[in-house]
Amino acid sequence: MKKNTTFGNAWMHRQLINMLRFVDERFIYVFTWTMIMPVCLLLNTNHSRSHAYRFFRNRIGLGRWSSAWHTYLNHCLFATVVIDRFAMFAGKRFDIEQEGTEYLRELAFQDDGFLMFSSHIGCYEVAGYSLTPPGKRYNALVYGGEKDRIMEGRQKQFSEHNITMIPIKEDMSHLFKINEALVNHEIVSMPADRVMGSSKTIPTEFLGKTAHFPSGPFAVATMRNLEVLAINVIRISRKKYKIFVVPLAYDKQASRKQKMEQLAKKYAEELERLVRQYPDQWYNFYDFWADKNAEPSIA
């Protein structure tokens, strides 16, 4: 899988964070929407425009003009949540609404560790890492090749919430750290909608067509019959995000293959529910329903 990092170099990221300490982020929103996004969509260098348009046209079922308009909105919202992430690094805070967090608190007081599956809808990083229940150490699986400034910002935020980063490595050594965390009855958070490292997938019905979800997260969960929560964070309005926490049940007495398929199906159903409710915040800019070897165009 091709791995891409957040747009811009370290100097640009540093200046943006410094600017956001003093400038209302709405000015940067408008500049990005009007000056940057139209150029990016016109050039379409990473094919994100094409993939987004087909998503709205074929999977959501919109007309041609409506699909084109929502492709623009989708890219503007993506830029907005990226800016919000840098605003968070600059020390700004957002109002967080929560739904279903009682499931998280319940699992926090059980002996075993558990998994939290995120996805590329909304912006998990703005609020999801604030869900750190007492009594258990929290480990977040992150892409290890990100720009230094992004990793520094993450580390600062994570240290405030007692979170340990597990960077994804080409040599797959992160799997040992995941295993160690779960053996120690800790929490591990990871995205479950994008293939990273291994090419093994589970074909699952998603938005009316078979999609290939990575088998890794579901294999980790079912190996120990762990409890799993789907956690997604959606941008509701300016300065406000909403956290959705949903338990993903599966038959722990079934065969390993059946357990993985059941868990992938439950995850896909919850993801589809949110995607249909907030289609403009779907940020998997590649053909999610193509051959399993298709490569994402941006992270």
Give names to the regions the model predicted.
Residues 101-105, 128-129, 154-155, 178-179, ...:
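Short amphipathic alpha-helical segments and helix-helix/interface helices
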Residues 11, 48, 96, 170, ...:
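Soluble or luminal CAZymes and related metallo-dependent hydrolases
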Residues 1-118, 155:
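Membrane-anchoring hydrophobic helices of lipid-metabolizing enzymes
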Residues 63-66, 70-74, 112-170, 195-200:
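Catalytic core of membrane glycerolipid acyltransferases/transacylases, capturing the structured
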Residues 96-97, 121, 147, 168-171, ...:
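A conditional alpha-helix N-cap/helix-loop micro-motif detector
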Residues 48-51, 147-148, 210-214:
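Active-site metal-coordination segments of metallo-dependent hydrolases
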Residues 2, 109-110, 133, 160-161, ...:
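Non-catalytic C-terminal accessory region of glycerolipid acyltransferases
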Residues 97, 164-166, 246:
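General small-molecule cofactor/ligand-binding pocket signal
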